[in-house]
Amino acid sequence: MGSVSEIVPLTTEAVMTEASHGIDDLHATPHKQTTTVAMDFGRLSLDSDLILYLFGTPGQHRFWFMWDDLVRGAIGAIVLVDTRRLADCFSAIDFFEDRKLPYIVGLNCFDGTLQHRVQEVREAMAIPDDVPIVTCDARNRESTKQSLIRLVEYAMQWWMQRHPEEQGNLSATR
């Protein structure tokens, strides 16, 4: 959130303590020292009349109580995938598919390195061919912005395919 928000983002980042032992799996990230404990909020203007309000929340099951509220009115979602921990992302993808909310998958590249090729991730996670998969570095403003732009493009395309009778309304509201 901090890499792309044009306002000072509201964040709930906290130092990890002994209380997280046995709760958070740090096997793939043994040097991790902070974690999001609730949600983040930010804003990004893609155009003078197209403003995105950004909400980010951890993927762990214990945070799901807020997911239904966060997706109400959403145009779509980015499932940010740490390729070192693919198994952690299945439930997030299921969540958005069950709610018929357009989503894209963002493969978070740490230090410009992917652990798996895009097609390998698509196959391993059974992501439909029409769902975009982008590579990004969530710490980099331009990379994150391009991922959000791709989400907006996909969400508009997704909506128009399912609601062709409202195409004029969609372009008029932009």
How does the language model describe each region?
Residues 1-29, 33-35, 42-53:
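Conserved G1/Walker A P-loop phosphate-binding module
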Residues 80-130:
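Conserved C-terminal guanine-recognition region of P-loop GTPase G domains, centered on the G4
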Residues 2, 68-70, 92-96, 118-122, ...:
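Short, glycine/charged-enriched secondary-structure capping and boundary segments
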Residues 8, 62, 88, 114-115, ...:
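Conserved protein kinase catalytic core
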Residues 4-11, 100, 155, 159:
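Conserved NTP-handling cores and scaffolds of large molecular machines
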Residues 13, 58, 137:
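Residues at the C-termini of beta-strands that transition into short coil/loop
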Residues 33-43, 47-95:
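Switch II of P-loop NTPase G domains
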Residues 111-168, 174:
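Canonical P-loop GTPase G-domain recognition
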